[in-house]
Amino acid sequence: MQTVLALETSCDESAAAVVRHKADGSVEVLASRIASQVEEHALWGGVVPEIASRRHVEALPALVQEVLRESALSISELNAVAATVAPGLAGALMVASVTGRTLAALHQVPFLGIHHLEGHLASAALGEQAPAPPYLVLLVSGGHTELIRVGLNGEMERLGRSHDDAAGEAFDKVARLLGLGYPGGPAIQAIAVSGNAKRFSLPKGRISLRGGGFHPYDFSFSGLKTAMLRTVESCQSSGGDLPLADLAASFEQVVADVLVERAIRCALDHNLTQLVMVGGVAANQRLRLLMAKQGKQHGVAISIAPLAYCTDNAAMIGAAALNRLSRGVLSSSDETGVAARWPLERADALYDASPAF
């Protein structure tokens, strides 16, 4: 059984975890800790990179000690140390990367630099039953909205993406517009529960093809954001209080509709009978229920990352590292740095002898 210490500091969550492969190939989380900075960044209406980096430096050492103590393991007993190295905030990424490399070198164990999105894809393995490839992944988070096909040998192919705002980013911006605070996803979900999702008609943004028609699997949320602004302005011009619950519910519903419709269509068009949903927005209850309902109607088996592992965490980074180890990847180059941007399709380059960055 292989065991990994994993570190995650790509944005505003400091996290450490110890995970291992069990005899049946499933992933067991021995310990997982997260230090959130949400309340501090909420004062600024979003993540402040310099503050995030400083808080990671302060929080990560204690988190590492806690997960090692809880798992009753020393670093020398591990098969590897893993850390997110791309993509994310460069200064924040450096904290986990430098910490992980240092610990690995001191204790003479391999180091694995992990792609953050590969971690999100692996988060589905932290549930009761890990999906077996091939399958389609809907990755929907604050920075990414993508449809990715995972092949039999773990190869990844992007089939759809957002051309502007990610879904999670749209939640944050609309929440700010409605005065609901940060982060937007939980804030909108909380007030939308009591709202009428059919009160306001909002657009389902599409991406035009050069030869005519629309891309069936791509996303656009900028037009929806503009439509929400105009709807709010129209309500304000009528006087009285804003119907916040109805606005939030209408917005939440159209985002869920778009994500589910295009994901299910993509799965069916590519003869994929499994669809996995991961990322922070996958925690949205309306989206989870709609995806499960539509999957059942169309004969597509739906797997959703456990709520505890939808948002950024180190357990998913550990799960991705275990996947790499099981495929014979032993180490990243000691010279590899971090990258604020790095496409998931080029994740294999993180393990080359000659570093990609």
From Swiss-Prot:
Keywords: Acyltransferase, Cytoplasm, Iron, Metal-binding, Transferase, tRNA processing
Gene Ontology molecular function terms on file: iron ion binding; N(6)-L-threonylcarbamoyladenine synthase activity
Compartment annotation: Cytoplasm
Residues involved in substrate binding: 139-143, 172, 185, 284
Coiled coil feature spans: none
Protein name: tRNA N6-adenosine threonylcarbamoyltransferase
Function of the molecule: Required for the formation of a threonylcarbamoyl group on adenosine at position 37 (t(6)A37) in tRNAs that read codons beginning with adenine. Is involved in the transfer of the threonylcarbamoyl moiety of threonylcarbamoyl-AMP (TC-AMP) to the N6 group of A37, together with TsaE and TsaB. TsaD likely plays a direct catalytic role in this reaction.
Cofactor remark from the record: Binds 1 Fe(2+) ion per subunit.
Keyword Acyltransferase set for record: yes
Cofactor: Fe(2+)
EC number: 2.3.1.234
GO biological process: one example: tRNA threonylcarbamoyladenosine modification
Lineage top rank: taxon: Bacteria
Residues engaged in binding Fe cation: 116, 120, 312
Gene3D superfamilies, alphabetized: 3.30.420.40
A single Gene Ontology CC term: cytoplasm
PANTHER family in the cross-refs: TRNA N6-ADENOSINE THREONYLCARBAMOYLTRANSFERASE, TRNA N6-ADENOSINE THREONYLCARBAMOYLTRANSFERASE, MITOCHONDRIAL
Catalytic activity from the UniProt record: L-threonylcarbamoyladenylate + adenosine(37) in tRNA = N(6)-L-threonylcarbamoyladenosine(37) in tRNA + AMP + H(+)
Family designation: Belongs to the KAE1 / TsaD family.
Main location: cytoplasm
